[in-house]
A protein has these predicted regions:
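Alpha-helical elements of Rossmann-like donor-binding domains used by nucleotide-donor carbohydrate transfer enzymes
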Residues: 57-60, 89, 187, 284
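Short, basic/glycine-rich phosphate-binding loops at helix/coil junctions
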Residues: 34-38, 69-72, 133-137, 168-169
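Glycine-rich beta-strand-to-loop/alpha-helix junction loops that act as flexible
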Residues: 74-80, 107-108
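Short, histidine-centered active-site or binding-site loop motifs used for metal coordination
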Residues: 37-39, 74-77, 172-174, 204-206
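Auxiliary Fe-S-binding modules of radical SAM enzymes
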Residues: 1-11, 66, 180-313
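Canonical Radical SAM [4Fe-4S] cluster-binding loop centered on the CxxxCxxC motif
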Residues: 10-53
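Conserved alpha-helical substructure of the radical SAM core
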Residues: 37-75
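Conserved AdoMet/S-adenosylmethionine-binding subsite of the radical SAM
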Residues: 83-224
Length: 313
């Protein structure tokens, strides 16, 4: 299943997610990633799956869910979606077939490639990440593919801003003692000024991260980021809203599919059971080992068992 949700998004409302790449295929190996360590760190773009199959799956989801209940079709992936070299074709087909805005959530690392920038030009909103303002923080926090340097990544985002007529909503992930000092925040702000996004979002780790010990900054550091960055939108709390379930036959499938791409708080998973008027799925999945309960910031999360190995590396 390439299309999933809709999931409640703090930025995009009811977002129908589309993953055109294999799990954990990315150009980064971020220490805060909720999907664990990157299995394939690469910059080579590929056709990972038949593009017609991906489009067909999106069409089935839109038909079942009803386009009126979808705010965005969002290419997000279980890694970096711009690694899919069919992304431009898929965006174009979505725009032709459905009157639903298209968003792309990207780490922004491949925007130095002209073909990537061209693939994104027909989307409505692009949401890149910019977590660092220097090479050393970039290497520590995002752990990019060896061929990607900070200046190259930043210049790609600057060039994209010059060429792109849609909206750019930039996200900055702040991690305690990594990029939340005054020096780091001011360096990030200098980079933001070059990109000139339409919106700036601050976020912090709220789900179990790839690297043990990753924590959100102290509240005072988040306030300081607000002071330095100026007008920003805050994503430092949990998302609200309901997941969409019309695309799933039962609670177990819904929990498995959503959890694989969007780790669930246990209360969210229990709510999914209630929506299907089912019970016992979660306890059964915990017993048979297909799900694992993980505590992060005093909040219980349910993750697929396959995550545990890559979260503990």
């Amino acid at each position: 299943m390439y299309a999933y949700g809709p999931v409640p998004s703090r930025r995009l409302g009811r977002s129908l997610g589309v993953s055109p790449i294999p799990p954990k295929t990315c150009s980064y190996n971020c220490i805060y990633c909720q999907l664990g360590q990157t299995g394939r760190v690469q910059v080579r773009r590929e056709s990972f799956y038949p593009k017609e199959d991906i489009l067909s799956d999106i069409g089935k989801a839109v038909k079942v869910i009803n386009s009126a209940n979808i705010d965005y079709i969002t290419f997000v992936g279980d890694g970096e979606p711009t690694l899919c070299k069919d992304l431009g074709w898929l965006i174009g087909k979505c725009k032709q077939q459905w009157q639903i805005p298209v968003a792309v959530i990207t780490n922004g690392s491949l925007l130095f490639m002209k073909d990537v920038r061209q693939d994104l030009e027909s989307s409505d909103v692009v949401l890149p990440t910019l977590d660092a303002g220097s090479e050393d923080v970039f290497r520590t926090l995002n752990r990019p593919h060896g061929s990607i340097g900070f200046e190259e990544m930043l210049q790609g985002q600057v060039d994209f801003r010059k060429e792109y007529s849609g909206k750019i909503w930039l996200e900055v992930m702040l991690v305690k003692d990594v990029n939340d000092s005054d020096k780091s925040l001011m360096e990030i702000n200098d980079a933001i000024k070059q990109v000139k996004p339409d919106r700036i979002y601050i976020s912090v780790p709220i789900r179990p991260p790839a690297k043990p010990g990753v924590r959100p900054p102290e509240p005072g550091r988040i306030i300081r980021a607000h002071e330095i960055f100026g007008t920003i939108l805050d994503l430092t709390d949990y998302e609200s809203g309901e997941f969409g379930f019309d695309n799933y036959p039962d609670a177990r499938t819904a929990i498995t599919e959503i959890c694989s791409r969007h780790p669930l708080r246990e209360e969210q998973a229990r709510d999914i059971e209630l929506r299907f008027s089912e019970s016992g799925n979660i306890d059964s999945m915990l017993s048979d080992g297909s799900l694992v309960r993980v505590e992060y910031q005093n909040m219980p999360y349910l993750l697929p068992a396959k995550f545990i190995g890559i979260l503990s590396k």
